[in-house]
Regions:
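Short acidic, low-complexity segments enriched in Ser/Thr/Gly/Pro
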Residues: 134, 144-145
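Active-site-proximal beta-alpha loop/turn segments in soluble metabolic enzymes
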Residues: 130-139
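N-terminal pre-domain/capping segments
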Residues: 1-125, 139-142, 149-150
Length: 152
């Protein structure tokens, strides 16, 4: 099979960050993750795109429109698309205080705006914004009914 039509194959960039740092393996730069993704091939099948975490050190969620355009061009030059985006939600858990929940919703909103800009630039023809409650199972289990309502 020389071409994969469905499902779209994407490589996530956040494994280049998560679990890495001064006390572990070095962070893999965003540019390196792009190059590795573009170069990867198995039996003639290549990745269609990347999924990105909207958090440092790879992506600044508050980057300018020009910065977003540069990001889109960088990905497009490698014949890749951007699919799912991971919202940076750990600043305020969905089951936290009123202020925490407001921050959580704001991060999701900003991620959606970022994703729309990528779509408008033609680099994100499909995709989702991934979120997590940023809350532990143990805290959720203390009051599953009401905590599920808070998360949902």
């Amino acid at each position: 099979m020389s071409q994969n039509n469905y499902p779209k194959l994407h490589n996530a960039t956040w494994p280049g960050i998560v679990g890495k740092g001064p006390d572990s393996e070095p962070i893999i730069s965003f540019d390196d993750m792009l190059q590795y993704t573009a170069a990867a091939e198995v039996n003639g099948v290549k990745f269609d795109g990347i999924d990105i975490g909207l958090f440092d050190p790879h992506i600044d969620l508050d980057m300018s429109d020009d910065g977003i355009k540069i990001l889109a061009e960088k990905v497009q030059k490698l014949n890749l698309n951007i699919g799912s985006l991971v919202a940076p939600i750990w600043g305020g858990p969905a089951m936290g205080s009123k202020e925490d929940r407001a921050l959580f919703v704001e991060m999701v909103r900003k991620s959606c705006v970022f994703g729309q800009k990528l779509k408008d630039l033609g680099v994100r023809p499909y995709g989702i914004v991934r979120i997590d409650s940023a809350s532990s199972v143990e805290n959720w289990a203390k009051d599953p009914i009401n905590n599920t309502k808070l998360i949902a």
